Amino acid sequence: MLNYQVKIGLVPLRRDCTPRPGAFNWEIAEERGRAIVDYIQTHYPSKNLSFADLKGVIPVETFYAESDVEKVAAHMRREKVDAILLINANFGCEEAAALLAQAPRVPVLLWAPLDERFDADGMRYTDSQCGVFGISRQLQRYNIPFTFMNSCRVDSPEFAKALERFARVTCMVKNFRGMRIGQVGMRPKIFCSVIFNEGELMQRFGLHIIPIN
């Protein structure tokens, strides 16, 4: 039975470092992360799409510490999320993000909102785009497949379109894994284009081919 309900885990990120003025300010990153999560949960749920956040899981609701990986991963498993959205509220911690993405083995979407807060002298308070570079490279090192969304505002049409596309792909992956497929007869000899490897389908995707003779 196909299931079209998709739940995405929202994981805002910041850097685990000594706080200091400017781009490594903890409070601004945490405030930004909570605001983005609240906006997504308010404006993007639908009949088939819901979200899970980190409220009550870690104190500041923004993920940064490797020591919290198992706690957050366990929460995502309890919530039965079908995918994870990594949100660079600031420069995220790439090691913690990769370890978390590795745990539930679900589709991952990596995104950084546009940096928008600047002082008159050019001082910026976030460096979200740089975090995407670091995290994407670490995900590659761990051989974790992921999707990237271009930097944009959370209230933009670009974000809405990319989120919907990711949710649709997640739905497909969710229903594809573990599928039982009935094979009625053998392929026609002349159609070499439909040759498949039953063992590889089982190993890679958990698909079961059921011969029906």
Give the predicted meaning of each segment.
Residues M1-K174, G178-N213:
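Metallocofactor- and cofactor-centric catalytic cores in central/energy metabolism, strongly enriched
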